[in-house]
């Protein structure tokens, strides 16, 4: 028989550090829309609701730096500073807002995503 009680939690000696050793940035986000917008932890932040106004180029390849399964809500007319962290793994993004469909680090994918974002009013001409 084991000395472990069913359901017992045995914590590690040190706290788990999420998103360690990944590139990070911060952006100020304003919800210019007329209703709240909520963004989940693993959504490619560059492709969030076009009513959210922020520096999208700096958010390319990034997601919210928050625990998995959580989200941040942006209320209409309000500004909020958020921390972003680089998407990990193979860094392939498909779907979401339909702006990026491929390898995040490929120059062609990035330039096409910026063009799509400008054409769909996600970001201003730059």
Curated annotation (Swiss-Prot):
GO terms for cellular component: urease complex. Its EC number is 3.5.1.5. One of its GO terms (biological process) is urea catabolic process. Signal peptide: none annotated. Its main location: cytoplasm. It comes from the Archaea. Keywords: Cytoplasm, Hydrolase. It is an enzyme of class 3 (hydrolase). Belongs to the urease beta subunit family. Heterotrimer of UreA (gamma), UreB (beta) and UreC (alpha) subunits. Three heterotrimers associate to form the active enzyme. This is Urease subunit beta. It comes from Haloquadratum walsbyi (strain DSM 16790 / HBSQ001).
């Amino acid at each position: 028989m084991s000395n472990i009680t069913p359901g017992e939690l045995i914590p590690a000696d040190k706290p788990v550090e999420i998103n360690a050793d990944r590139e990070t940035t911060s952006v100020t986000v304003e919800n210019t829309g007329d209703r709240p917008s909520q963004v989940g932890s693993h959504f490619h932040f560059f492709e969030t609701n076009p009513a959210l106004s922020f520096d999208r180029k700096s958010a390319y390849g990034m997601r919210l730096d928050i625990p998995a399964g959580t989200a941040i809500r942006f209320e209409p007319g309000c500004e909020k500073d958020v921390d972003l962290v680089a998407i990990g793994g193979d860094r392939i993004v498909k779907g979401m807002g339909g702006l990026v469909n491929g390898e995040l680090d490929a120059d062609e994918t990035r330039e096409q995503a910026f063009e799509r974002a400008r054409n769909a009013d996600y970001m201003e001409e730059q």
